[in-house]
Amino acid sequence: MLYLIVERFRDGDARPVYRRFRDQGRLAPEGLRYLASWVTQDFACCYQVMECEDRALLEEWMARWQDLAEFEVIPVMTSADAVAAIAPRL
């Protein structure tokens, strides 16, 4: 399953997040796959796409970062999957 993660850096400060990432890596458990991310120009927020079969892996990953960021999780699908899913209802 694909998830869009909205990651808001605590106090709008990305430095602690990037410092930990530099020193420890992504800290993702086995089975959670990072696909891509985009960061706002003011470094206040990051939008990531992650993939995993077990939502518990995503929760485990977020727990490792919750002291530095707040998370919103939105289950998403690719546009191709959306076309296939809605086609029978058109």
Regions inferred by a protein language model and the residue ranges of each:
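Short S/T/G/P-rich N-terminal loop/turn motif that feeds into the first structured element of a domain
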Residues: 1-35, 39-45, 53-57, 77-90
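A short local loop/turn or secondary-structure capping micro-motif enriched for an aromatic residue
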Residues: 13-14, 67-69
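Small, basic N-terminal interaction modules of short regulatory proteins
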Residues: 49
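Short, electropositive alpha-helical surface patch
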Residues: 58-65
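Conserved short beta-strand edge segments in small beta-sheet-based binding/regulatory domains
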Residues: 68-79
